[in-house]
């Protein structure tokens, strides 16, 4: 080994290393002394102070090889270009958040143009690209500036239309709307959990598909977050999970500027972030100067060198750097104004026009990000071609997994006379789907035994066994759902997650993001009504059905028996652009007459006639889930009195709403106004189906603690009460 003395620090290099010549080149004007030296760290970062009026150099020792990285005036110009494009876009819109882009531009630039392997020419089509998630989505102007400079399909004109109707540059990033955006992160904190999910997917697919000499899944997930993200509970849930899972290819860049919208974070956020993340099992790296490109680069290298822990790089920045009011909340969420922009540009020594990109900056991105990305993707294509020749079946499975095609499965029908809870029939469906869809995996928020989500004969997804298909999300409902979004966004798998339906309130913000992003995630929500019983009103859903049904682009399905549950799972696994929420019972449900033949087609229309009136149609009983059996029994009781009613099973209101007017009329004829809806949940939303002349047998108060059957009786879910209620129409 050998060392090079710089006057202040010792740099250790490997003798005859290819990097030695580069090292000598940088120090060619200085007398160099070499001597044998041993016992240094395998993974170390070394800094060199100014040498011969040169900028500070950085050396990173990874596995005893030395990497050199330097930055020059063009790099600084590129950083300032990101800043000025962001400021100009926000000013043109007269709306936006300039503080983060101005403060975080250096770390974002270093990451993008010097580290990330992405190819703007193929965008999100290359499965092994690095992923970047902007959890602090209010800093979208910075992301759009980077996307433009990187060469994605985003023009200067698009930047000028920031936050305008129909533009490619909405106020917060939206996947599938803006080229190159990886996730719609939405409210703060969720992007961190999305990144955790992406890193989980990478680890899972790598364990499943990689072979010696063929690391076809081998990429990093980077996320940029601020102080606000770390205050949110979902980020803490997700960070805890990531630390346990030892996701070494997950890197958070923390824009630590000590300012939130209301003012200094000292008013509300004073914890030891380093201590917290180290307790989670993360590596913490501090960058003291957020404008020091070399120090940022060293931190990213050190993060990539740590393979057993996720890394958070805390970068101390100045919010709104360069602005007259930098370092204050005044620059967080409002345009700087013409005078404010002029002040900042003067501080940057910016001599170019508004929205101008200097030619040398364009060239620097072409030589950096673009050239590196194209080379990396071509190398991967060559590797995959060889992999395909060596492992054709695995290669075909990999390609199929990323095609996001509708999965078709066959599920064993349930016979009349049998009885089981829909959560149990769901578990049987999960088992059968796992045997037919190799990319299918998931778990529960510490309720797998109750939600019945575990796949038998499969291993657990744990460190050292990332191939496992049973995921233990822990008591982290929000992080589970947000991580599922990241898993779905990554591609290559189909994921599900379960909890009690009453706990759905904990995860709805992430379900909303799934629906907004057209992600085919599946939520297994069990213990769906007051039939939960003894646990009492805190654990008995009432308003949840009405709440989730109001969410656009979410299939909410409450099946009546095992055959409807099968149909629900078939529908869910066939979806490619919409999440599905299955609402399932704790208590046993008998298989109903007719569902074996009618359920699949009927469920795919949202509602269907399960039992027709025996005479001239006088009225309609509409029910869902466990109450369909009550409707059938009520029909029989009314028939005994000479009253002829139809029973409509309506497992999914939203799917029914999407049917043609003709079909809806065939199920609920306008001329038939005597209608009774029966459901053990809120009445909210049922008026559109029963009309002004109809009634509901529902619950608009809280539940109680008692055996489930007794509660149903006390709340009027009996044949006698349903019969009298119908007759009162």
From Swiss-Prot:
Gene3D superfamilies to which the protein is assigned, alphabetical: 3.40.50.920, 3.40.50.970
SUPFAM superfamilies attached to this UniProt entry: Thiamin diphosphate-binding fold (THDP-binding), TK C-terminal domain-like
Needed co-factor(s): Mg(2+); Ca(2+); Mn(2+); Co(2+)
Catalytic activity: D-sedoheptulose 7-phosphate + D-glyceraldehyde 3-phosphate = aldehydo-D-ribose 5-phosphate + D-xylulose 5-phosphate
Co-factor binding comment: Binds 1 Mg(2+) ion per subunit. Can also utilize other divalent metal cations, such as Ca(2+), Mn(2+) and Co(2+). Binds 1 thiamine pyrophosphate per subunit.
Signal peptide per UniProt: none
GO molecular function (one): metal ion binding
CDD domains: TPP_PYR_DXS_TK_like, TPP_TK
GO biological process: pentose-phosphate shunt
Residue(s) at site: Important for catalytic activity: 97, 332
A cellular component term, taken from the record's GO annotations: cytosol
Keyword terms: Calcium, Magnesium, Metal-binding, Thiamine pyrophosphate, Transferase
UniProt entry tagged with the keyword Coiled coil: no
Enzyme class (EC, first level): transferase
Function: Catalyzes the transfer of a two-carbon ketol group from a ketose donor to an aldose acceptor, via a covalent intermediate with the cofactor thiamine pyrophosphate.
Name of protein: Transketolase
Provenance organism: Streptococcus pyogenes serotype M6 (strain ATCC BAA-946 / MGAS10394)
Protein's gene: tkt
């Amino acid at each position: 080994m050998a060392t090079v003395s710089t006057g202040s620090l010792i740099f250790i290099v490997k003798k005859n290393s290819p990097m030695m010549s580069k090292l000598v080149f940088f120090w060619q004007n200085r007398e160099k002394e070499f001597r044998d030296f041993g016992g240094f760290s395998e993974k170390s970062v070394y800094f060199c102070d100014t040498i011969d009026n040169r900028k500070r150099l950085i050396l990173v020792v990874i596995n005893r090889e030395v990497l050199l990285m330097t930055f020059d005036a063009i790099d600084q110009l590129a950083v300032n270009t990101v800043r000025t494009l962001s400021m100009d876009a926000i000013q043109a819109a007269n709306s936006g958040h300039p503080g983060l882009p101005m403060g975080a531009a250096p770390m974002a630039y270093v990451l993008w143009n010097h580290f990330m392997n992405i190819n703007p020419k193929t965008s999100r089509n290359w499965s092994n690209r690095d992923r970047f998630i902007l959890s602090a989505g209010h800093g979208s102007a910075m992301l759009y500036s980077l996307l433009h400079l990187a060469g994605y399909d985003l023009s200067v004109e698009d930047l000028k239309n920031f936050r305008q109707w129909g533009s490619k540059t909405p106020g917060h990033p939206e996947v599938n709307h803006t080229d190159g955006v990886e996730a719609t992160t939405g409210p703060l904190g969720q992007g961190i959990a999305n990144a955790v999910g992406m890193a989980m997917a990478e680890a899972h697919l790598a364990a499943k598909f990689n072979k010696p000499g063929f690391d076809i899944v081998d990429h990093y997930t980077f996320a940029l977050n601020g102080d606000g993200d770390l205050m949110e509970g979902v980020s803490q849930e997700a960070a805890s999970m990531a630390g346990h899972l030892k996701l070494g290819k997950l890197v958070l860049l923390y824009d630590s500027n000590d300012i939130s919208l209301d003012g200094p974070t000292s008013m509300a956020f004073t914890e030891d972030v380093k201590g917290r993340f180290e307790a989670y099992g993360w590596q913490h790296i501090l960058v003291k100067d957020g404008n020091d490109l070399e120090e940022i680069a060293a931190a990213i290298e050190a993060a990539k060198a740590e393979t057993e822990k996720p890394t958070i790089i805390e970068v101390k920045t100045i919010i709104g750097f360069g602005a007259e009011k930098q370092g204050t909340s005044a620059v967080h969420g409002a345009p700087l104004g013409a005078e404010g922009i002029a002040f900042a540009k003067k501080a940057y020594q910016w001599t170019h026009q508004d929205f101008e990109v200097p030619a040398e900056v364009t060239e620097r991105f072409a030589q950096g990000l673009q050239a590196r990305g194209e080379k990396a993707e071509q190398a991967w294509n060559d590797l995959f071609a060889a992999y395909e020749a060596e492992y054709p079946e695995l290669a075909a499975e990999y390609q199929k997994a990323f095609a996001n095609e509708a999965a078709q499965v066959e599920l064993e029908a349930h016979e009349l006379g049998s009885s089981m809870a829909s959560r149990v029939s769901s578990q049987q469906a999960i088992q059968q789907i796992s045997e037919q869809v190799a990319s299918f995996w998931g778990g529960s928020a510490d309720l797998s035994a109750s939600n019945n989500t575990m796949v038998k004969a499969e291993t657990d997804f744990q460190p050292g066994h990332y191939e496992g298909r049973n995921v233990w999300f822990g008591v982290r409902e929000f992080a589970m759902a947000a991580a599922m979004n990241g898993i779905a966004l990554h591609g290559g798998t189909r994921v599900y997650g379960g909890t009690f339906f009453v706990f759905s309130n904990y995860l709805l913000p992430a379900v909303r993001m799934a629906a907004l992003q057209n992600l085919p995630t599946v939520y297994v929500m069990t213990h769906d009504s007051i039939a939960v019983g003894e646990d009492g009103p805190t654990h008995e859903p009432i308003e949840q059905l009405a709440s989730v049904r109001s969410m656009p682009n979410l299939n909410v399905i409450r099946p009546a028996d095992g055959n409807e549950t099968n149909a629900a799972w078939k529908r869910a696994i066939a979806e490619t652009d919409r999440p599905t929420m299955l609402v399932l019972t704790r208590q046993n449900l008998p298989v109903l007459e007719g569902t074996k033949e009618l359920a699949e087609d009927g469920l795919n229309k949202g509602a269907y006639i399960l039992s027709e009136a025996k005479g001239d149609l006088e009225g309609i009983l509409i029910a869902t889930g466990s109450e369909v059996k009550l409707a059938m029994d009520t029909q029989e009781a009314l028939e005994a009195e000479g009253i002829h009613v139809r029973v409509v099973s309506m497992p999914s209101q939203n799917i029914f709403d999407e049917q043609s007017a003709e079909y809806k009329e065939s199920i609920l004829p306008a001329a038939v106004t005597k209608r009774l809806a029966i459901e053990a949940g809120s009445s909210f939303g049922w008026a559109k189906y029963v009309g002004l002349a109809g009634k509901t047998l529902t619950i608009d108060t809280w539940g109680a603690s008692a055996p489930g059957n007794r509660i149903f009786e006390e709340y009027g879910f009996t044949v006698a009460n349903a019969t009298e209620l119908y007759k009162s129409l």
